[in-house]
């Protein structure tokens, strides 16, 4: 996690020195290392997410915290979560100390426009709110869980707004508008997706593809697996992959893909018992399956295509 934060700070330092790449950060919520076709899952295809590894670098042994808020806080600051005051995921334990600075603060100081579109989970009130942490624009929700994924009420810069559609599609729309609006200036676009975190809810067209799908790869302890929950997770990730593809297509359309760093990872292990590379553990566990995450970084011309990083 400190390595990932260091990469961001190096990019920010380059911006201060004159080189100003855009930065797009895509964060999955409760996706396991094994939830991607790139990592051997044969039950779904994630071509757009996989392309980030194929066209950039993938980190084979990247580790995060076993639950949401600590990982997010460490990523935002490059510091260990307990030093930030983050000791849990609710009742105020998810909040970072007000004195902490985030990478959004640093990018903003370097002249970037900054936006976040999705789940925050590091404090809801000022001075813990995203707008107090270096972000110019916020669409999403600040809590760790949202009960409705269709036509959900979402916050836009302090005002609650009723959205229309599936939450991942809606928030991707907002991120695309942000990129389009700021195409002529350097931007930091942080998209912490809400899926595959529960509630297990997905658009009908995605569910139709997976509702009767035989599961050919199962959890280490198959009796603990709920097949329909796994099928819904697969559908949610297929939807997420499609939205990643929309973001990548927008960068290409605007001729920004060679000037943009794109990062993808997950905040912890899988939220249910399902295939995860045959690793023991899931979300909430410090076993490998609970803390090992995918990490893909694409920066054309700077990162060698297909590079593999084996170091922890």
PLM features: what roles do these ranges have?
Residues 1-9:
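Sec-dependent signal peptide recognition
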Residues 3, 14-312:
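Formylglycine-dependent sulfatase
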């Amino acid at each position: 996690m400190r390595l990932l934060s260091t990469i961001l700070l190096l990019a920010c330092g380059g911006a201060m020195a004159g080189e100003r790449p855009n930065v797009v950060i895509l964060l999955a919520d409760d996706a396991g290392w094994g939830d991607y076709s790139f990592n051997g899952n044969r039950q779904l295809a994630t071509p757009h997410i996989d392309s980030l590894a194929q066209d950039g670098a993938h980190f084979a042994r990247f580790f995060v915290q076993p639950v949401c808020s600590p990982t997010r806080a460490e990523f935002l600051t490059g510091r260990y979560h307990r030093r930030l005051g983050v000791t849990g995921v609710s009742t105020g334990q998810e909040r970072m100390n007000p004195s902490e600075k985030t990478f959004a603060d640093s990018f903003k100081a370097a002249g970037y426009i900054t936006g976040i579109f999705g789940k925050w989970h590091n404090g809801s009130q000022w001075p813990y709110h995203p707008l107090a942490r270096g972000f110019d624009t916020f669409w999403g929700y600040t809590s760790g869980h949202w009960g409705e994924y269709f036509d959900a009420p979402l916050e836009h810069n302090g005002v609650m707004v009723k959205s229309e559609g599936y939450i991942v599609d809606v928030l991707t729309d907002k991120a695309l508008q942000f990129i389009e609006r700021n195409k002529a200036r350097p931007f930091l676009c942080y998209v912490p997706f809400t899926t595959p975190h529960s509630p297990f809810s997905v658009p009908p067209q995605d569910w139709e593809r997976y509702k009767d799908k035989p599961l050919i790869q199962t959890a280490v302890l198959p009796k603990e697996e709920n097949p329909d929950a796994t099928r819904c997770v697969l559908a949610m990730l297929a939807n997420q992959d499609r939205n990643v593809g929309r973001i990548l297509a927008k960068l290409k359309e605007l001729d920004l893909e060679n000037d943009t760093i794109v990062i993808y990872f997950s905040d912890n292990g899988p939220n249910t018992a399902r295939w995860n590379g045959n690793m023991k553990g899931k979300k909430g566990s410090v076993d490998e399956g609970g803390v090992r995450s995918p990490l893909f970084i694409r920066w054309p011309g700077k990162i060698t295509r297909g590079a593999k990083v084996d170091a922890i």
